[in-house]
Amino acid sequence: DTQAVYESIRNGDVTISHEVWQSTFGKSFYTAMAKGGIIDAGTHTAKTLEEVGVPQWVVDKNLCPGLPDYKALIKCASVFATPDSGGKGRILEGPQSWHGEEYPDRVEALLGDDWVVKFAGSADAIWADHASAKKEGRATLTFNWTPNFTDADGFVFIEWPPFYPGCRKQDGGDSKCGSPIGWLKKA
């Protein structure tokens, strides 16, 4: 719980948080700073991205020609079908509490009815899916983020239309956009 970490810093129980992600923790970070007792200790050189994509080997094996362009997914839905997707291409998102309807809205807007978003119970479920897909030689399309340990094995993020403020349905847009690139700070 990030907010608990910020409160612990403010109370002197924790000295530093080395990982404040703009997209998921930015608002609570600035709220904590406004209360006092916590500072912006600088920005890492690494940029952050929280997005769906494929393990590098899916691209290397050309399982869906044209990746990472999202338009390739329109023609490859069957390649990403799983037993629980009803014959549709499946995107394995993190737990629904992470992003709500953000990815289902985007999939509906850009990929249509041939795709379905399934929610994993945890990050570990996503990594287990990567491992089983690699062992079985099947394509998988999952949520991921960078920087992350998966960077070492290679992970290719889908290239959606660029993010702009207001593009998501919950912000009044049509959800025909990808995720923003963000900063990574220390508190």
Regions found by a protein language model. Give the residues of each.
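Extracytoplasmic small-molecule ligand-binding "clamshell" domains
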Residues: D1-S17
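Flexible, solvent-exposed loop/hinge segments that line or gate ligand/substrate-binding clefts
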Residues: Q3-A4, Q22-G42, A109-L111, K118-A187
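Stable alpha-helical elements in mature extracytoplasmic
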Residues: V5, G66-D69, L73, H99-Y103, ...
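Loop/turn elements at helix/coil->beta-strand transitions in domains of secreted/extracellular proteins
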Residues: D13-T15, G86-G89, L111-W115, G137-T140
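Structural recognition of the beta-strand scaffold that forms the well-ordered cores
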Residues: T15-E19, E50-G53, R90-G94, L141-N144
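A residue-level marker of the well-folded mature domains of exported/periplasmic proteins
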Residues: V59, P65-P68, P83, E108-A109, ...
